[in-house]
């Protein structure tokens, strides 16, 4: 029996289709998750070692501009541009309908770094002030801030990963120059992650279980 063979050229062709032409129709329902789709497409080409070869500097700059167009003025990134009211029409009342999300923010950061951007246009302080507002009392993180600043969605380890990754990219190990910006509660986050560990030495994706004896 012949083993499976990785078809690199076919993968490259698929990613380029997603990047430069219309997305497959099965992705239509995921329009609000375009940042996620962009991440997997660009990261896929980068992992295959052809991102620089198969895209021009002008194209890569265009992708960077699209990412920044998804940046929310109060910090973080939205999943796509469809909820953007524009600077003149955005108000504290309607901002709840155009929220930044933790996954989109993390993916935006990684895409920008992959494309060679210096992150100088990222609203660093605003994003780092927004991040702790999404942390729950148990240490986990939500997805977005809803009406009244209520934390919505998330709660599992994926969102913990997105939050920690975003924090590291923007704050670094020491947080130099950001001493006046409130940090997330790292000990609580660690406790939540540890509480998700089960006796089989794996981690449950959702809520914590009883601590290991």
Where on the chain are the PLM-derived regions?
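Preference for long, amphipathic alpha-helical scaffolds in soluble/luminal domains
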Residues: 1-213
